[in-house]
Amino acid sequence: MAKSLIIVESPTKARTITKYLGRGYSVMASVGHVKDLPTSKLGVDLENDFEPQYVTIKGKSKVLADIKKKAQEVDTVFLAPDPDREGEAIAWHIAQELHGKGKKKDGKVYRVLFNEITESAIKRALKSPGEIDMKLVQAQQARRVLDRIVGYQGSQLLWKKVRRGLSMGRVQSVAVRLICDREKEREAFRAEEYWSIVALLAGDNPPAFEAKLHSVNGQDADIGTGERAQQILDAVQGKPFVVQSIERKEKKRNPVAPFITSRLQQEAARKLHFSPKKTMTLAQQLYEGIEIGAEGPTGLITYMRTDSPRISQEATEDARVVIRERFGVEYLPATPNVYKTQKAAQEAHEAIRPTSAARDPESIRQYLEQDQYNLYKLIWNRFIASQMVPAIMDVTRVDSSPVGTLDRYVFRTTGTVVKFAGHTAVYLEGTDKELPSRKPKNEQEAEDESDRQLPALREGESLHLVAQEAQTLPGLVSKQHFTQPPPRYNEALLIRELEEKGIGRPSTYASIISTIQDRKYVEKVEGRFLPTETGRTVNDFLLKGFPDLLDTEFTSHMEEQLDEVEEGTKPWVSAVRDFYTPFVREMELAQGIPGPKDIVEPPTNLPCEKC
């Protein structure tokens, strides 16, 4: 008979852990949270320090009964939910049901933590059990209470003022505001015309290359009309050019840190076109365990909710062995790369990485679904690249001018040649390409020329214009452009904006983005978010009634206070009160503001068509 009971959230996680442990252990799953606030009422005692009134979640009574029964049969209980706020809250609620506080002194109920589901990590955790971190429990409780207060009371107000079935959220409403604000910016935007002029030049050596007009009379080329563009074309057409200056420099491109949650969601959106929700679902599957042939259920990546880029020494050495063997010592830095941890990140956490660097994507491809494989490959490549040397590029900038114009017109071209690929041999970070909402300051803003291959050139060398089809004049092309409105958010851009403004936390981004779509406040059109009519109506009402609640700085400050609860520097009740006081004031304000339901059409003398 088992002497120890291990409790986790997920049946998949339970199966993977069972594989690594002997008969002395029994593993059970709580299948998520076992207790929560009631669905039928507020469930928070506003008069008694916001005391939450937890109840057993529907369908979980039998789960708890089974856990309690099994706990009576063993000597020790190990609570092993995920290593984050939600996991700590699950552990705490189960510990209470087992009549223990999760402290070592209870002699029976312990908390164990591991960031990866591997044999070594699990056995290491069981050898050094700890106690429930009440700071994490209180941080989760504070967030849950705040979200319930706003969701319950705020949504009731929306039902009264706008229409039934609507919801309000402490963070979701701010996310909707960002999308509505961006749409207003786009509607107010007025496009500006600008022109570019490109010369196709050739010297003594092939190939011919393009150069853009960079400056006129020493000032940035700012061509606002077609007439002005034609004046410049007339001044330079048919003239030979001369190379005025050549600037060469070596440039290093450093590797990027291994994934944290927000970066994984952004990159998966850019490169794989996954929604944050899909990314986190797949990552959870890879974390909890996939059947890998004879190995059985195997945890393939570390815990996927993290804001720390830290890598354990063991994992670092693991990566360095792979780099040395598969790429060569020239790709291996003399000392491991170390990445800075953000201010509020939990040092106990690690970055999202493979549990074994030796388990490359191709070696397990046959066991993974296509989406699982694509995400695992993204994580593996990023992790390996993070421990490689920088890429080295030779960057060349060439300025040339038409002969006889006294250097009045300077045309510039820039080319980059990769001298040593370094980490880019494995991984290149994606970008969020945005169309310009103003005139580019120079040609490199207007167009990326980094991959341009330049011929061998020397200062003073004569160049000539090369005629091609579809050119405005032989060797010259003028193009009309218009500045574009600020882009609508896609998943990657919205996550970046939420992160930069401190709204929500990486572990909540996926649910925020899913919720605002499920509520029909925003919709996706061609991969970009647009506010719906409902979203605009709700946002307009909330902006009038809840100016603080929808203020990004207020929301960010609230997140910082909740982080302080997690760090143990602020009582959770104090953090909730700091939010609740202005919330009550704004609720009173909003009650007096007319919503769509309050607006009644004035009576007319026209007969009713139905009467």
Regions found by a protein language model. Give the residues of each.
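Phosphate-interacting basic helix/loop segments used at nucleotide- and nucleic-acid interfaces
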Residues: 55-78, 178-179, 267-268, 375-384, ...
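Intrinsically disordered, low-complexity regulatory segments
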Residues: 1-144, 214-215, 224-230, 335, ...
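C-terminal or mid-to-C-terminal helical accessory/interaction module adjacent to the motor/catalytic core
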Residues: 72, 117-201, 245-252
